[in-house]
C-alpha cells in the first residue's frame, strides 16, 4: 500500500474524530477515493439498469430497517433511563454500608459471635478497601493499578456514572475521602461520543488532579549525582512520567490540526484511545453495576469461566477443521491410489499412500498482551 493511502486513512480518521461528525468521515473517504482513482465512487453507475432497480429496492428496504432501528434505540434509551433511576436507591444503600454510614442488622447470636471473634474498634466501620479490591480483581483494571496507587485508592468511597446529552456520551465520577495525596474530593472522566449507539469516541476529558507536594503518583523524580570534578556539587533532579491508574484522568488528546500528527503517531494515538475507552467502559458496565461480585472475586471467576468456554469452542472448531483436513487428505490419497491402480494394473506391487496427520489444534482464544497507559 502506498504512503498516500496510508496517510489518508489516518489523517481522515483524525479529522473526523476532531470534527465529531460521521458524515465528514464518509465524505472524506469518498473524496480521497475519488482523488486516488480519478473516478466517482457511485457503484450504481457501474450496474446494468435491471440490477440498478433491484439495488434501489434493496435501499428502500434498508431505509425501513433503519427507521425501525432508530425507534429501537429511542425505546432502549427510555428503558435504560427508567432502570437507572430504579438502581439509584440500591447504590445509595451500598454506599452507606461500604462507608460505615449505617450498620447492617444482625441477630443477637451473630452480634455475640462477632464480639468474641474481633474487636469492633480495631476493625472499624464499613468495608475497607472495597473499591480498590473490586477493581484489582478485574483483569483490565488490575493492569493499570500500581502498588503506589493502592494507598490513594484506599480512600475511594464511591464510583458513579451518568449519561450526558450535549454532547452525547457518559461521565464517570470517583468520590474520594480526605487523603494525603490530592485535594480533589471528586475526580471525573467524561467521554464524548460521535455516535452513542455505536461506541465511536470523539474525545475524552479528565479532571486535573491537585496533588500535594511530593505526592504525585503519575510522576517520579530521578536524582543523578554530578560528575566528579563538576563545579555544581548538587545532585541533578529529573522528573519523568510513570505508570499509574491516575493517568486515566489525563487521557490522550486528538490534535485539532491533522497536519500535526504523522502516521505512526496516529496509530499509537488510536490504540491509546481504544485502551482508554476500554478502561472507562469496564468501570461503567462491570465494576459499578456488580461491585460486590468483583470485591468477592465471583465476577472474576465468571469472566474466567466465560473465557474458558470460548477457548473450548475455539478448540472444538480447530478439531473439526483438523478432521476435515484429514478427510480431505484421505480422499486425495484414495483418488491418487485409484489413479495409480488404473495406470499400473499390471504391476504386482502397488505403493500405498501414507496419511499425513494434521497437527492437533493449538491453544485457541489466547488474549493479546494489554498495553499499559503511559
From Swiss-Prot:
Its main location: nucleus. The keyword Chaperone applies. This is Nucleosome assembly protein 1;1. GO terms for molecular function: chromatin binding; histone binding. Residues 26-80 form a coiled coil. The lineage of its organism: Eukaryota, Viridiplantae, Streptophyta, Embryophyta, Tracheophyta. Signal peptide: none annotated. The modification Cysteine methyl ester is found at residue 371. Keywords: Chaperone, Coiled coil, Cytoplasm, Lipoprotein, Methylation, Nucleus, Prenylation. It comes from Nicotiana tabacum (Common tobacco).
